[in-house]
């Protein structure tokens, strides 16, 4: 997102000027969000990425290889393909740390993440830490009766500081079962 902040600041500011923020901090958070979205859209352009996703039936590893992106970047981008007239499968995306805290989330589905507390302990995203490098699949049903196909996998990120431990997360990607035939 640093590149977006450095090269697209005028565009970001013009977009932010269209909104009414209650605090300067809220505006700053929104600016980072826009810069992150810009970065993802630059790395994984909408139409080319959407076509590739359909072509390989949304295979996260193949998409990551094809676009030189991480599994997490690919999963997150899939959850944002909701442009009017060119919508992709409505996916949800989640990233959790080893304590079970949701650290990143996005949903184009009816699934709503809890604002407080943890996610269901039976959800496969929690078991992903036990099977490094492997995708876990799960059929899950929410209390409102909606059924989801859920994928989960562990991911690691360098901490950045000298000798700092590697940060481990699990990512989850899912869609309503009615879309499973497209995967």
Enumerate the predicted regions with their spans.
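Conserved binding/catalytic microenvironments
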Residues: 1-183
């Amino acid at each position: 997102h640093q590149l977006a902040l450095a090269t697209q600041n005028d565009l970001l500011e013009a977009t932010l000027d269209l909104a009414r923020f209650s605090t300067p901090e809220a505006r700053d958070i929104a600016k980072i969000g826009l810069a992150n979205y810009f970065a993802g859209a630059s790395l994984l352009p909408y139409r080319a990425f959407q076509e590739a996703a359909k072509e390989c039936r949304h295979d996260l590893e193949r998409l990551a290889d094809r676009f030189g992106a991480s599994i997490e970047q690919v999963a997150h981008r899939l959850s944002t393909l909701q442009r009017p007239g060119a919508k992709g499968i409505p996916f949800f995306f989640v990233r959790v740390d080893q304590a079970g805290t949701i650290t990143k989330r996005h949903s184009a589905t009816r699934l709503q993440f809890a604002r407080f507390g943890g996610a269901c302990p039976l959800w496969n995203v929690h078991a992903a830490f036990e099977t490094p490098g492997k995708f876990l699949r799960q059929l899950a049903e929410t209390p409102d009766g909606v059924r989801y196909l859920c994928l989960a996998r562990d991911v690691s990120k360098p901490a950045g500081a000298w000798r700092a431990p590697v940060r481990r997360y699990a990512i989850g990607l899912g869609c309503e079962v009615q879309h499973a035939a497209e995967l």
